[in-house]
Amino acid sequence: MPADHHPLRSVLETVGPESCPGQFNFHCHTLCSDGSLEPLALIRQASSRGLTQLAVTDHHSSASFQPMQDWLKQQRDLGETVPILWSGMEISAILRGCLVHVLALGFEPAHKSLAVYNQGDAAVGEALRAESVCQAIHDAGGLAILAHPGRYRVGFADLIDAAAELGFDGGEAWYDYDMQTRWSWSPVVCEAIDRRLKNLGLLRTCGTDSHGLDLEGR
């Protein structure tokens, strides 16, 4: 599926500073990588808090996706209102000589192009290059998103520009760089990142990057 026609695109086009953590969360973790919650505990919490759309983005693992999808189907069959879950994974990559993280969203979890990234550890060699990561995500039918652009040793403007040149679909605009107990996006830096992404015609996402027991905290 071409990224321009991806069904998640229309959702991400509505993301704003107030979308996270109550409505959307496209960046969080479970015990399948370095998070603290079991996958089913996370999806139950997301459902009980009224989230409408989310993706769990464990590092180099999509193992949490199917168990959560199975639980959501059970709940829908019982007539419950539950969130829409998109496949997700956080992948390490080298961009402009800097180690960055790329969020893969809405891809086919078993696709062969992502096998090298879906084994629990970062890839090596050519597969670690950002262009290789982006192409693999697209080959698997997903969207490639630059995670937390303001967290790296290279400035966010250079990284966003480089990502755009490589065909990335977007960047994580709304993020808590102060890592507060309760998630809140960081003024100034998030607004600047959002403007740059918007000016380049890129999608903007949001997420708590939760690794703990509370989806609304870091």
Predicted segments with their positions:
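Divalent metal-dependent hydrolysis catalytic cores, especially in the metallo-beta-lactamase
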Residues: 43-64, 84-86, 142-145
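Short acidic, glycine/proline-enriched helix-loop-strand junctions
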Residues: 62-86, 181-205
